[in-house]
Amino acid sequence: MEIPKLLYIAVIAIGLSGSLTCATPLANPWADPEAEANPKAKATAEATAEAIAEALAEPEPALPALPLLAFLFSLPAVQHWIEKNWING
């Protein structure tokens, strides 16, 4: 199977446009060479690290999801029983 040349051109164009966007300091504050001096970037990084640490420290129990999953997985059996006994009865 031959890949069309237009697909190659599209992939290259999208890749170049994405890399140019990331390299522009106005479009991407993380690409700023003085990122350490940027208080917004530092505050964002600290908030992200804190949120990840909290999420990993206190995982939510999976128990509330089990009754919901049991209910959802039983719906096809209930539908089959209703069709068999009430509709086609």
UniProtKB/Swiss-Prot annotation:
Propeptide: 24-61
Cellular compartments annotated: Secreted
Predominant location category: secreted
Signal peptide (from-to): 1-23
Residues modified as Asparagine amide: N88
A GO term for molecular function: sodium channel regulator activity
GO cellular component, one term: extracellular region
Tissue distribution: Expressed by the venom gland.
Keywords for the protein's UniProt record, in alphabetical order: Amidation, Ion channel impairing toxin, Neurotoxin, Secreted, Signal, Toxin, Voltage-gated sodium channel impairing toxin
Task performed by this protein: Vertebrate-selective toxin that causes pain by targeting voltage-gated sodium channels.
Membership in a protein family: Belongs to the formicidae venom clade 1 family.
Listed name of the protein: Myrmicitoxin(1)-Pr2c
Species per Swiss-Prot/TrEMBL record: Pogonomyrmex rugosus
